[in-house]
Structure formats: C-alpha cells, structure tokens
C-alpha cells in the first residue's frame, strides 16, 4: 500500500512529497492518520479536477458571448444592407445626384457633407435651366422633387433611420428655389416636403 500512497504524492510538488514521505514513516503505526494523509494526498490530486471545470464554464460563456456578438453583427449587417438598398432606390429615382446619394450614406456622421456634395449637383442644372426654356427645365426638377417625396415615404416606412435622406430633399428644394422662375413650382413641393417631414 505504501507505493499506492506514494503515487498520488509524486503528482504533487517534490517538497510536499518529501514532507508526506516523512509523515508516512512517522505514522506507520497510526492507521487513522495514515488514511488521513492519504486523503490529504488525494485531495490536492482532486483539486485540479474542479479547476478545469470553471474554465469549461467560462468557455461556454465565451461561446455564448461570441454567438451573441455574431448575432449582433448579423443584425448590424442587415441594417447596413437595408440602408444602401433604400438610398440606392432613392438614387435610382432621383436622376441627377445619383452618385452623391450613393456616396453619402457611407459616411452618415458627415450629414452636412452630403448636402454640400448635392449642392453642386443641383447648381449644375441651373445654368442649363437659364439657357433653355425655364418651363422645360422646371418640369424635371419638380418631378424629381415629387419622386423624392415618394422615396421619403418609402424610407420612412422601411427604415427607422430616416434622417439620412430628409435633410437632402429640403436642401434640393431650397437649392433650386434660388432660381426665381422655379420658385412657384418648388414652393408647393417643398411645403409638401415639410408635411412629410413633420
């Protein structure tokens, strides 16, 4: 039995093994103490067993945490996919500043930025509007404005973050309002815009 008791001791550090060895010699006659030292030897041998358990628990928690994160990322990706789709839809509907529409959602923090990038797009048709007959030039802009209204409606229905497009449409209407001939058409439209916005 001595070697049997020796084996668990070896698994401990050599110092404690030495210590136990000494004890075992001492307590050769005392059986209860011997069994006690045996339990002592086995209890450190068991203590590593519970210790792998908490790690496995933490691993499980980590897995759950990772899964949650993955789900969150998937949700974010879905939202990101939805937004460009809608803005692309609006871009396809509004003929002139389509490039700007596509670029602006990529940097939502710079909301004033898209408006700046849209201004030149709106100023560009203005010279052509003055050279050509104004009614013809006014017609496309008004249709574009009404299309923007429809796009706004869709955006409101589809995505909660509707603040991406609304700042643009008033910017468009105000921008083209700079031209007096168009003022009539666009004033009515911009007021409708405001109704939609409110």
From Swiss-Prot:
A Gene Ontology molecular function term of the record: zinc ion binding
Gene Ontology CC annotation, any one: nucleus
Coiled-coil intervals, chain numbering: none
Biased composition (Polar residues): 95-105
Keyword Transcription regulation listed: no
GO biological process, one term: segmentation
Keyword Amino-acid biosynthesis tagged: no
Keywords noted in UniProt: Developmental protein, DNA-binding, Gap protein, Metal-binding, Nucleus, Repeat, Zinc, Zinc-finger
Segments of this protein annotated with the region Disordered: 16-116, 158-198
Superkingdom classification of source: Eukaryota
Basic residues biased stretches: 17-31
Cellular localization per UniProt: Nucleus
Biased composition (Basic and acidic residues): 179-198
Entry function: Gap class segmentation protein that controls development of head structures.
Family named by the database record: Belongs to the hunchback C2H2-type zinc-finger protein family.
Protein's name according to its UniProt entry: Protein hunchback
